[in-house]
Amino acid sequence: GDVYKRQSTFYFEFIAVDNNNQSSEISKLIVNKGIVNYSRELKFSNLKCVSRITGAEINGTNGLPIVEFEVNNRTNELYNVGGTDLGIVWELQPGHYGLFFGDTFGSDFYPNFVNPGPNGSNWRSNVLLFSDDQDLSDGLTINGATMDESGKNAREICYGGKDGSGNGDWTSIPTAAIRANGIDYVHYMNIRNWAGWITNFSSLYKSSDNGITWTRCQNVKFGSTSNFGQVSYFKKDGYIYMVGTITGRDNKPHLARFLEENIENQTEYEFWNGSGWIKGNETAATPLFNDISGELSIAYHPEFKKWILLYFNSTRYDISFRTADHIIGEWSKPQKLVDGWQYSQLYGSYIHPISLKGNILYFIMSMWLPYNTYLMSAELKCNP
């Protein structure tokens, strides 16, 4: 194919290698201007909505289309999950995935054209469902949940106070999840007031029994104006990389990292300031690029040797797609992965780990109407 070149910053890259001959992305040193080859840019095509993951069949209810996307699961009947959003997915054990959902309502939930979004009874700030599905081409199958004592309801994991006054503990919303050293962690934001996405703090819960019981990690806490109030995690070369923003959808992404064993030791977190890693000083972090983002999802694709970042952009009203050879950049310009004018009231774009095998990108997207989650797919291809 044609090779496209442009003047850009040229980098020397220094790679640290540990005793197991594993490399670690640690730094890039800017030395001069040069020519960078952009011929192997990662592109996507053939975007599809594969299926709806959560909620009941709609079939014309409240004016919605008679034929909607196929629903793979009866979450309203089996787990009392009628309306929900997000679907942050990670791998607990090989082939066993957890999916964290946000504010969740029971089987009496119904999509409402006049006032879309949450409604109904049995409000839980978050729930955790499970999937062992290895073939997502026909949809994502849910086959379990962390249930309450009655065995009838998926239970709340991260406590939310349900105080809608705007001056207390409104709800607790998951933003990312990961397994580190055999323990599963969820990062969440504790919402004080949805007007302005004001939080009390962000923190972690952890589980040592594959997602059945969870406890709060009291020693990890991010303030209400932290650049890591909402995050996405990815493990690579012994590190967990954390891309985050101030809570909301109007802020630029920042980058941190820590060794896997230090996830509960916040003093060991390192923050990227544009030229190096700064330990223990969160305010040193500088933006990865100049673009506002919400509901980030980061992953490294080993076959394409590319980092992939998905996020909601409110200005363009889309799910944006960026790539980079190294997580510290240089990041590609945003591509429009999903158009909000085609999928109205869209948000969230959480990459399924199964995407990192092969050339199909699977991600979970939400729509405010009908306030449920969808499995999306796109084909990936690198320019030759």
Language-model regions, residue ranges each:
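Short, small-residue-biased leader/transition segments that mark boundaries at the very start
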Residues: 1-4
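Asp-box/BNR beta-propeller loop motif
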Residues: 19-22, 207-215, 324-333, 383
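Extracellular fibronectin type III
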Residues: 21-37
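N-terminal regions that are enriched for targeting/export leaders
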Residues: 36-180, 186-189
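Structural signature of eukaryotic scaffold interfaces centered on beta-propeller domains
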Residues: 83-92, 166-182, 227-238, 292-303, ...
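Conserved Ser/Thr-centered positions that define the repeating blades of beta-propeller domains
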Residues: 89, 131, 207-208, 258, ...
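Conserved blade-ending motifs and adjacent loop-strand segments that build the rim/top face
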Residues: 331-355
